[in-house]
């Protein structure tokens, strides 16, 4: 995968040289290029200006972005504009992006964008219902979530498939050594070696956690018959005061 990032602050992306994203680059699975669009700005390198019609703040000018895009060698890239007014970013969107060969992220700054910039864009995406100083942190988050889904980036291909949200549910609790730490013991079922009991326990815990913490996810979740039976049992137990 090839990723191009348009930003005023390329140095902010240093964390992408480490961890999973850095390893993907080392394996030759990922190529990232940073483009400071101030380098393409006319008018004394100014990238912003006052909005027509008045108003507070400054807008990112179209010219530096257009000229930077013209300089990028890309065939049919997915062009993502980081914008708090965009569609919310979700795991399913990361899975979709992981299938692309070329991605371009446009990181804004200031009050907003000249509307004409959006003619270059295929997707307007928001990290959430809040406003950041710039799009860099949002872009890094989306890139990390996407790159880890590229085949062969993670050690085990199945490891991301059980992550929270990948299945549509939150992930079940997990434990490692020691068995007993400060009086907190690993659930007996995980020590039993009985694979079917462990599978059912994990399913129940995943459904329960999702119901308690993110019930909105269950509104569109496609329950199997087995999950529906377990979920009904969970709701019944909770209504009777079960913890």
Swiss-Prot record:
Its EC number is 2.1.1.228. Pfam families: tRNA_m1G_MT. One of its GO terms (molecular function) is tRNA (guanine(37)-N1)-methyltransferase activity. Gene3D superfamilies: 3.40.1280.10, tRNA(m1g37)methyltransferase, domain 2. Keywords: Cytoplasm, Methyltransferase, S-adenosyl-L-methionine, Transferase, tRNA processing. It is found in: Cytoplasm. Homodimer. This is tRNA (guanine-N(1)-)-methyltransferase. The lineage of its organism: Bacteria, Bacillati, Bacillota, Bacilli, Lactobacillales.
């Amino acid at each position: 995968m090839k990723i191009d990032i348009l930003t005023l602050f390329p140095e902010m992306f240093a964390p992408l040289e480490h961890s999973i994203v850095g390893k993907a680059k080392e394996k030759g699975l990922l190529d990232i290029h940073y483009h400071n669009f101030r380098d393409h700005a006319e008018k004394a390198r100014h990238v912003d200006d006052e909005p027509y019609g008045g108003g507070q703040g400054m807008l990112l000018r179209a010219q530096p972005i257009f000229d930077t895009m013209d300089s990028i060698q890309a065939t049919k890239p997915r062009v993502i504009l980081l914008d708090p007014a965009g569609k919310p970013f979700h795991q399913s969107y990361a899975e979709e992006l992981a299938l692309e060969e070329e991605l371009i992220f446009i990181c804004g700054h200031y009050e907003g964008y000249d509307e004409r910039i959006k003619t270059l864009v295929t997707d307007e995406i928001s990290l959430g219902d809040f406003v950041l100083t710039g799009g860099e942190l949002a872009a890094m988050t989306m890139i990390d979530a996407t790159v880890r889904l590229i085949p062969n980036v993670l050690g085990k291909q199945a490891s991301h498939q059980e992550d929270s949200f990948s299945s549509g549910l939150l992930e079940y609790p997990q434990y490692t050594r020691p068995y007993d730490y400060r009086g907190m013991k690993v659930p007996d079922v995980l020590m039993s070696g009985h694979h079917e009991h462990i599978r059912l326990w994990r399913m129940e815990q995943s459904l329960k956690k999702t119901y308690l913490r993110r019930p909105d996810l269950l509104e569109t979740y496609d329950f199997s018959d087995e999950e529906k039976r377990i979920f009904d049992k969970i709701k019944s137990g909770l209504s009777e005061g079960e913890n």
